[in-house]
Amino acid sequence: MLSILKKLFGTANDRTVKKLFSEITKINSLEPAIQKLSDEELKNKTVEFKEKLKNGATLDDIVYEAFAVVREAAKRVCGMRHFDVQLIGGLILHRGMITEMRTGEGKTLVATLPAYLNALTGKGVHVVTVNDYLARRDSAAMGKIYNFLGLSVGCIVGGMPDEVKRAAYNADITHATNNELGFDYLRDNMKYSLQERVLRPFNFAIIDEVDSILIDEARTPLVISGPVNDNAELYGKIDKIVRLLNASDFEKDEKLKTINLTETGITHIESLLSKENIIKPDTSLYDFENLTLVHYINQALRAHNMFTVNVDYLVREGKVMIIDEFTGRVMEGRRYSEGLHQALEAKENVKIQNENQTLASITFQNYFRNYPKLSGMTGTAMTEAPELKDIYNLDVVAVPTHNKVTRLDLDDEIYGSKKEKYDAILKLIRDCYDRGQPILVGTISIEKSEELSSVLNKENIPHKVLNAKFHEQEAFIIAQAGRFKAVTIATNMAGRGTDIMLGGNPEMLIEQLDKEHNYEAKIAEIKAQIAEEKKQVIEAGGLFVIGTERHESRRIDNQLRGRSGRQGDPGKTKFFLSLDDDLMRIFASDRISGVLRTLGLKDGEAIHHPMISRSLEKAQQKVEGHNYEMRKNLLRFDDVMNDQRKIIYEQRTEIIKSKDSHGFLNSTTEELAKKIVLTFMPVGSYREDWDIENLSVELHRVFSIKFDHNVVSKNDVTEEEITKTVIQMAHDIYKSKEEAYSSELMHNAVKYILLTTLDQVWKDHLYSLDHLRQGISLRAYGQKDPLSEYKREAFNLFEQMLNNLKELFIQTVYHFHIDLKNVQKEDVSLEYKKLQKNMCESREDPAFSKYNAGSSLETDLKPVVSRIDPKDRNPDDPTSWGRVSRNELCPCGSGKKYKYCHGANE
């Protein structure tokens, strides 16, 4: 019934596209008049549009004419005219939706339409890509159109200095990678003046390869971190011990990606630890004093048994580098958290870096939801449409191709073993190579690509390998994968964003020419050669894409297929599978093995059966559903932190903007003074119960006040009067500092202290949230909802953080002094970095940890004192306590608050 209704009325997507086609006629009707304009008149249209917007017009009022102007500009500048389907894609993007357009349909050109239109508001447009190469390429190519029309263009890539980035972000249209945007947002919110920030307020973003960024990378947060003091040596010792374990000592679940010691494993590892004098002979691994070792052991087990070199990570220049499982690219600057990266470094016998403490973090899910208007484009999004709608409120519209797709997608071939599968793949590659048909072979890991490469080398078949190890050559290799007799092996979707043109890409070959020797002649020669090869390739059947395994996601498989058959070109695709493949082995092996046994599959034979295809698709849907739930669950928890992050970042911005820092100082001084007095002189208590001695100690610790006991000796004195006296004494101390340093310098100093203290307590708060998050799932065993528990406890931690902020801030303000030796008397408007250099503290406190707020992950940040999990603290060893909050119970076990016990003299 449903299929009949769809035939009668069409799908919702069909109806949307039909409606959009009716709008395209309005743009096309303007084309003759726009064509008659001179270059100068065409450029002046930008000024005209801006004037209309200034006078109250909306973007929708000028959308058709603006699109017609961009189309004409592209034709004059680049020789490219937007097709009708590209105009439809532009309208979809402008309206804050995702457009699904097949590979080769010109998505880069499509983005110029909404980018130009929305840039007319002067608020900036971000065009987001997945790597630096694409950002540079697109800004250079499409920038010609924008510049012709009088708009400025910027490009953001890694490693740029802030002043260059600031100029690029202030341009009308900015091309940038998703990573740099996220990191710049975090870095901006760690800076000490608005002038140091590089980003403008969020406005409109167009995300290229939107599925890769919003779905594939959604589970990996961007993190800026600083090293903490840690026992790197212990990772090496534990690694050596874990290598001695037997397979029966642990059990792993590949579906759930977990690994745990068995009972025999615990006994075995306890004896090994005892021999190495890591634990005492008569103790258990799970005794209180040894509990910290469990973390190291678990991470070492994961490193050795759940992570594979050249699949999950690679080792380059003595460093362990993470490989993106979806793109096959190295994730520059990323490190696994919770000690896993250190465990991998120990496994690979490279230098073990210190563990890091999070200074700032955000997921792409929450970063991109900051934009008031968001859109995206990709070749594959319909399978993930429910998730994109649910999480980002983005509708997906599939746009028809300009030319009919003639690519032939052949049925999968399934073999009993990996060797049989590889033999069949090799036979097909040999056949295509002999006929000159170009082949692109997709693998799921570097290991598999190199394995296949070695097989082709033995068969003397020339080929190129494209994986994370050769990232710099990625675009060039993939662009030439359509040449006559070309054989290219690519990990997953490496090279995505670069079209494979039949016969080769002449522009990239021309770029490599020596411009001084016969340049024009060589260009003509290259173009002639490419044209000839294109004819040969078309005769051979176009690009043949071979998949060596099914991916967990159908979308990734569709992306691989989409590399062939661009713009109506001929081509073929085929997947080769075996029962040894991860997806088949983990999720579908039993069912499919039964079918194969029933059908009597013999060695070397392949099978094509609808039941197997359905089973495989169900397995993929199962994994997709599981991954979606993981991403959705991550978002639910991250939303809690995101709400708190927004509050902190807004407060930070307000502090920076503030021209009077005394308001918060005075109110907090009064609040703490009242609190301290009431602690030692409770309301309604007798005079003999007042603890004047500890009141004096606490007032000196917090305010640097030398409290006169004679004030209390008066018979008629009240708590209120003492509070007023304390507040006045605090104000007097502050005034004496103003007289010594000047009001303006003190204003800057107080602002700086407030910012650094806020950064410190926020950093500690992130650490606390991380620990809370790690164990919160166990609440389910107590019939409690982990998410509700997390929200409740995270709120309590946030309130505690704000209280700690007030106390640390006041304590620092009243104790600090400035070294004026290197400060010019006339220079009262010191920058924050100068203040940081010249400030001295009267005591050591983690609140004064210095780090470069603008540092990227690669920058060496000074070590910070971290908070230690309470269960890891030795009550008899204060050096093991780490950072202790003033209001926590003292780790020594006395039952008193830390500030009244071991922290009384700080």
UniProtKB/Swiss-Prot annotation:
Q: Which SUPFAM superfamilies match?
A: Helical scaffold and wing domains of SecA, P-loop containing nucleoside triphosphate hydrolases, Pre-protein crosslinking domain of SecA
Give the enzyme class: translocase
Entry's Gene Ontology cellular component terms: cell envelope Sec protein transport complex; cytosol; plasma membrane
* UniProt-listed Enzyme Commission number(s): 7.4.2.8
Q: Which UniProt keywords apply?
A: ATP-binding, Cell inner membrane, Cell membrane, Cytoplasm, Membrane, Metal-binding, Nucleotide-binding, Protein transport, Translocase, Translocation, Transport, Zinc
Job of this protein: Part of the Sec protein translocase complex. Interacts with the SecYEG preprotein conducting channel. Has a central role in coupling the hydrolysis of ATP to the transfer of proteins into and across the cell membrane, serving both as a receptor for the preprotein-SecB complex and as an ATP-driven molecular motor driving the stepwise translocation of polypeptide chains across the membrane.
- Write the protein's name: Protein translocase subunit SecA
What is the organism of origin for this protein? Rickettsia rickettsii (strain Sheila Smith)
Lineage of the native species?
Bacteria, Pseudomonadati, Pseudomonadota, Alphaproteobacteria, Rickettsiales
